[in-house]
């Protein structure tokens, strides 16, 4: 029996109405696309592409092309629908696959992993993986959380939803780490608390409506538990402790 590659079901449910699966807003992605000075015809590889909003809107606004890979069948289908809706299906392609270890057969002008650096065990591994698919002189995009406020204890870190304080860095240390990997940061765009609100709070209505529509589903207990806990966790921890941003890198 073959098992379909997928993300945990709680995310498939809670983020099923999201176009963007991170704390960026449409405006932040528009800003990022503008400040990167993308050239028409540039080709972008996006590992962990979610519902494809970055590639689709940049294809519309900047005439880029590209490939997005995501392990969620639902999000991949949504990305294809979004490309069709924006009239860019001829420029961008979306594949349902595991991005871990993926190395493209061709080289890209931009190689991105926005909020999914777990695919290669963290930032350093993801930078190394993306570099395999990058043209000489090309640009990497890394989307990564960082500590806005460093937890005082390991218990506090776990309450934030990470396993240890060491899982994330404060922003200055994260920025320094890119240099230590041999890269210049050539641009960055940071999320704000409004972006976190849009990412997290949008899940609550989705979960509530799912519960109303699926009261007898065996997964309803887990969704109910998440809905009970999520709002207070967000305003107590996520909103206060986490920063997030996309960093553009070029090899020194």
Regions from the language model: what does each represent?
Residues 110-123:
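A short SAM/SAH-binding and catalytic strip from SAM-dependent methyltransferases
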Residues 189-252:
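Conserved Class I S-adenosyl-L-methionine
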């Amino acid at each position: 029996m073959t098992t379909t590659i997928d993300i945990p079901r709680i995310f498939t449910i809670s983020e099923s109405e999201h176009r963007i699966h991170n704390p960026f807003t449409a405006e932040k992605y528009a800003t990022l696309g503008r400040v990167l000075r993308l050239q028409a015809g540039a080709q972008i590889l996006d590992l962990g592409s979610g519902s494809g909003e970055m590639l689709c809107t940049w294809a519309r606004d900047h005439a880029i092309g590209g490939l997005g890979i995501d392990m969620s069948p639902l999000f991949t289908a949504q990305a294809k629908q979004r490309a069709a809706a924006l009239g860019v299906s001829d420029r961008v392609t979306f594949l349902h696959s595991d991005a871990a270890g993926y190395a493209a057969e061709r080289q890209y002008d931009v190689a991105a992993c926005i909020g999914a650096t777990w695919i290669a065990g963290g930032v350093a591994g993801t930078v190394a993986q993306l570099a395999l698919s990058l043209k000489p002189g090309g640009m990497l995009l890394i989307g990564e959380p960082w500590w806005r406020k460093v937890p005082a204890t390991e218990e506090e870190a776990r309450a934030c939803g990470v396993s240890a304080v060491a899982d994330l860095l404060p922003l200055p240390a994260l920025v320094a780490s890119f240099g230590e990997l041999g890269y210049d940061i050539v641009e960055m765009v940071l999320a704000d608390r409004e972006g976190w609100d849009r990412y997290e709070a949008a899940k609550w209505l989705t979960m509530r409506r799912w519960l109303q529509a699926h009261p007898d589903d065996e997964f309803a207990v887990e969704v109910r538990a998440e809905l009970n806990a999520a709002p207070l966790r967000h305003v107590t921890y996520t909103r206060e402790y986490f920063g997030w941003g996309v960093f553009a890198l070029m090899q020194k």
